[in-house]
A protein has these predicted regions:
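Glycine-rich flavin
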Residues: 67-86, 234-236
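Aromatic-lined carbohydrate-binding/catalytic grooves of carbohydrate-active enzymes
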Residues: 53, 62-65
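Flavin (primarily FAD) cofactor-binding/catalytic cores of flavoenzymes
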Residues: 1-27, 33-51, 55-57, 86-337
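Residues that flank catalytic or metal-binding motifs in active/ligand-binding sites
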Residues: 63, 72, 123
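Short, flexible helix/strand-to-coil boundary loops that buttress conserved ligand/catalytic motifs
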Residues: 58-62, 69, 217
Length: 337
């Protein structure tokens, strides 16, 4: 009750900044894609982004990260990503493109603004950020997942006295030189970080299942085909037994191919426990470890929506075609499936 009183008192003192048709929360690629179509339809909107500049999650990605598809398949609506130096665009090239895209269309963007909660007010949604708020007929949440890294908590990792970090906080391989490192996770981030760290450290790759590699001549374009086929099937009310593009998840970009030539793209089953300076495998054997890099994915960043009663116990929001099923003027984009 005390916390509720304080919240209401703060809100009563908050200053209305603007009334618009739509508030977009987040400033990454999903937010920009949404903004493009709102502007085309002449819908009034504002983007509230908690970053200091354009680029979204890419601002925090590790230095060597690359897109998994060529620039021609990685563009937003209206303006193609310029030709890049390499087949797969680099982190900096993506940031430059997103920044230029935002400037090109002159989207009304305010940053840094951290939205802490939203309240319903009659038919409107009031979007609060500290002592400021924006009133909207609808809200598009595009906060993504990068700020909510997922790390398994059921194996006693608090016992481990070595280095632990998530891929969200990984920058480059330098801190791991000459160390014994375990990379956990069988997706693209795990493969890319393993490829880089294995050049300077003794590495072990841990995955729950055998890594699934795409063929060398197949890239991230296959994911677009899969997503399109899945969406079409959903709209037509049918199920898919085999998705387009064949098997595999890990894109064989140059750094991963190079790691293959060094024989490091082999993994083993997950360890079952931590000790202070080692991990314990299922057979009871131990392995000395200096650092663990968790490439274990992310959860949706939904804290700002909790006061609306739309976040389910499994920490998701039930949607149909991107629209909240509990609140019809709330939309979510860019969170994956």
């Amino acid at each position: 009750e005390y916390g509720f009183t304080i919240t209401k008192r703060r809100d009563a003192l908050a200053q209305l900044q603007a009334e618009v048709d739509v508030v977009i929360i987040g400033g990454g690629q999903s937010a920009l894609a949404t903004a493009y179509f709102l502007k085309r339809k002449k819908v009034s909107f504002v983007i509230l982004d908690d970053q200091s500049q354009a680029g979204g999650a890419w601002l925090h990605a590790w230095q060597s990260l690359r897109l998994f598809s060529p620039h021609t398949w990685s563009s937003l609506s209206g303006w193609m990503m310029p030709t890049t130096e390499h087949t797969y665009p680099t982190r900096n090239e993506v940031i430059e493109y997103l920044s230029a895209y935002e400037q090109r269309y002159q989207f009304p963007t305010i940053r840094p603004v951290h939205v802490d909660h939203i309240e319903q007010e009659d038919d409107y949604l009031d979007v609060y950020a500290g002592d400021q708020y924006w009133r909207a007929k609808a809200v598009v949440s595009a906060t993504g997942t990068w700020s909510k890294p997922h790390i398994p908590n059921d194996i006693g990792r608090e016992k481990f006295k070595g280095i632990q970090l998530h891929s969200a906080d990984y920058v480059n391989a330098a801190p791991f030189k000459n160390k014994k490192v375990i990379v956990v996770g069988g997706g693209n981030s795990g493969a890319q970080i393993l490829a880089e760290v294995s050049k300077v450290a003794e590495t072990t790759w841990v995955t729950t299942t055998a890594p699934a590699f795409l063929s060398d001549d197949v890239d991230g374009r296959v994911w677009f085909l899969r997503a399109t086929e899945r969406l079409k099937a959903q709209q037509e009310g049918r199920s898919l037994e085999q998705l387009a593009g064949g098997l595999g998840d890990i894109v064989m970009i140059d750094s991963v191919k190079e790691a293959r030539t060094r024989g490091v793209l082999h993994s083993r089953e997950p360890f079952v426990a931590f000790a202070e300076h080692s991990v314990v495998w299922a057979d009871g054997s131990t392995q000395a470890v200096d650092a663990v890099i968790w490439c274990t994915g992310f959860n949706p960043a939904l804290n700002h929506l909790r006061g609306l009663g739309v976040v389910e116990p499994d920490q998701t929001v039930a949607v149909h075609n991107g629209r909240s099923m509990k609140l019809n003027n709330l939309w979510l984009v860019g969170y994956g499936e």
